[in-house]
Each structure stands twice: as structure tokens, then as C-alpha cells.
Amino acid sequence: MNDLRMYNVLVRPLVTEKSTMQLEKGNQISFAVATWANKPQIKKAIETIYSVKVEAVQVSNAKGKTKRFGKLEGKRKDWKRAVVRLQEGQSIDLFDQGA
């Protein structure tokens, strides 16, 4: 997988109450990833971009919600969530506090 495609695998980090607790207790970080990405691609992208060792990757597909736009009914995009467990002693600083 080339470098440009690796950056397309990770869409954004997910910051929720649940993901914050997972980060504090279990050294796990949640990401929204591309729907076409599989576990080995996600693992390789995170290890390359953030220079950390990944212990495990869990993925789940989330269906897009049905929403109304006035009279029209539309649907949000389906997306994929990845929960990445890092090895002991590894960490990712997603938000640079020094700026």
C-alpha cells in the first residue's frame, strides 16, 4: 500500500465519552476509517503514520441514519469504526497541547 493511500484509510479520530474512557483505561483509540479498509490496512496505516506498535484492531460498520430535509427523506453515509489497542508503553498524542 503506497503512502498516499495509507492517509486515506484514516478519516478522523473519534472523540466521545466512551472512546476517552477506553483511552484512559485500556490504551485503546477509536478512529473513523474508510469503508473499504480492512484490519491489516488499518493496522499498517496507524503504525506507519503514528510510529507506534498496534496489538489489535476491532472494526464495526455503522449504518447511516435516515433524516428528513423538509419534505424529502435522505440518508447519511454508512461509515466504519475501528478501535485500535496499542501495545504497553505506546501512546498517540492526537491533540498537540503545546501549540
Swiss-Prot record:
One of its GO terms (molecular function) is structural constituent of ribosome. The keyword Lipid metabolism does not apply. It comes from the Bacteria. The keyword Iron-sulfur does not apply. GO terms for biological process: translation. Keywords: Ribonucleoprotein, Ribosomal protein, RNA-binding, rRNA-binding. One of its GO terms (cellular component) is ribonucleoprotein complex. PROSITE patterns: RIBOSOMAL_L23. One of the early assembly proteins it binds 23S rRNA. One of the proteins that surrounds the polypeptide exit tunnel on the outside of the ribosome. Forms the main docking site for trigger factor binding to the ribosome. HAMAP family: Ribosomal_uL23_B. This is Large ribosomal subunit protein uL23. The gene is rplW.
